[in-house]
Amino acid sequence: MRRFALAALAIASLAVLAACQGGARRPACPAGQVCLEYGNESDPLSLDPQTSNLVTESRVIGDLMVGLTTEAPDGKAIPGMATSWEASADGLTWTFHLRNANWSDGRPVTADDFVYAYRRILDPKTASIYAYLVTILKNGQAVNDGKAPLSAVGAAAPDAHTLVLTLEHPAPYLPQLLMHQSFYPVPKHVVEKLGEAWVRPGSYVSNGPYRLVSFHLGDMVQVAKNPQFYDAAHVCVDRIDYYPTADVVSAERRVQRGELDINTTFQSNRLAHIREVMPGYARPALVQATYYLSFNTRDVKPLKDVRVRRALSEAIDREFITDKLQRAGQKPAYSFVPPGVSNYAYGAQLRWAAEPLAQRQIEARALLAQAGFSARHPLKLELKVANATETLLLAEAVQADWRDIGVEATIAQNETQIAFAAYRNRDFQVGAMSWYADFDDPVTFLGLLKSDVGEQNYGDYKNPAYDALLEAADKEPDAVKRAQTLKRAEQMMLDDEGMAPIGFSVSRSLVNPKVTGWEPNPLNFHRARWLCVRRS
């Protein structure tokens, strides 16, 4: 009964909140132009492709910039700045042929802009969270560790329209990986002149379908069509206004009133209501994403104990969370790699996954007792979450599950930017996370828990044997053997309770039926260059 009361309370509180919310009116669109009003959950912290790390940032940056490859409407890799490429027989050398293209200030985009960008992101002074992706380039890790000069990075520009990348190991998924913002070029001529100030409106120079017009924190990021873009003739939307919409119920009402054309999320347990009052707007779709709990194993002594981590994970009623609380198509997760990822051999899962919840609760209490906790000396933890309503409801369900095994958990809710700053600084005990695939390969998930990844291994999970398996997979040329090695690595991490998977996500976008070109895809990429808005 406690669980159903929690779900009912959540729905009732959301209804009250929705009734109290207002919202700004839709801004005027110049005559003859197409404008897109876009709810984007939170403000970007950075529009620099090499220092950004949030999904909300990548949405905007991905409309401003284009890498060697880019996303088709279905999320697959297609030519971007590169018109073609070929790989050597050993898979270690890739040659890319660049198109004639300009930056938004009219200067040509050259291969040297890419070389400069890759050296910049790997420079230890940049302190990029995503540098670990670019360490796939030859000597990338040594450069990022400060043990080799920037010139050692495996990227060369024989001429203005040829880029040669040399890799540390074969990577058949490289065209997918190169869509990621960490591999975007930056305008060398601007960054060298302005430094970090290059990202400000009036200074920002882009090579993608849009250019930056304004950025008002807490209000709006505005971009306009870039006439210098190589495919500008086929870009429909002239202006995009991105709004922070942390209050998803308020954003839902704004979409309903026509003030927003898109909001990138909605409250899961409101799906049936939305479908009733706004038919055709809700676009739930399975994506390559997992939400999970991260345990701070560096600073929190009890969480260094695998028995405690297992107890906390075993006690979570995943089916209640996905089927009763969320109810938008999420699936319970007993592994980290979600369904549908290419190049993988599925089968790894938490060893106790098939046990009924009651049995798991008994085991969890016993494990806590073995670790020295009791009713007189209960385990006390803080669960830190971002301020999204969805995440708070999840946290409350986990809190209740832990109470059932004698764990006293408090919830600390912070603004998204503050929460992630705390995660990066390891200023948390347990954190509620989610991870959307950066590219279609299991490494985008399993690599997060590698010891040398850095800040995004939020819990500082360290297991040399796990690292060794991932490194062996990197060097394995046989695709089947590589997939099996990655499966062994995931099973090892799950046996060690390196994190607690909770559910496999669905994208939950609200899209006005007047918006065309929005295609569901596993990576949840929806670049604005493919969208249009039908006039009434």
Task: Please describe what each predicted stretch is.
Residues 113-115, 122, 126-189:
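Surface-exposed binding/hinge segments that line
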Residues 21-23, 156, 322, 357, ...:
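Extracytoplasmic/peripheral linker and loop segments enriched in polar/acidic and small residues
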Residues 332-370, 388-393:
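Structural transition elements
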Residues 39-89, 119, 203-206:
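N-terminal lobe/hinge region of extracytoplasmic solute-binding protein
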Residues 509-536:
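Long beta-strand-rich cores associated with HINT superfamily self-processing modules
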Residues 195-201, 227-273, 399, 408-410:
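Ligand-site clamp/hinge motif
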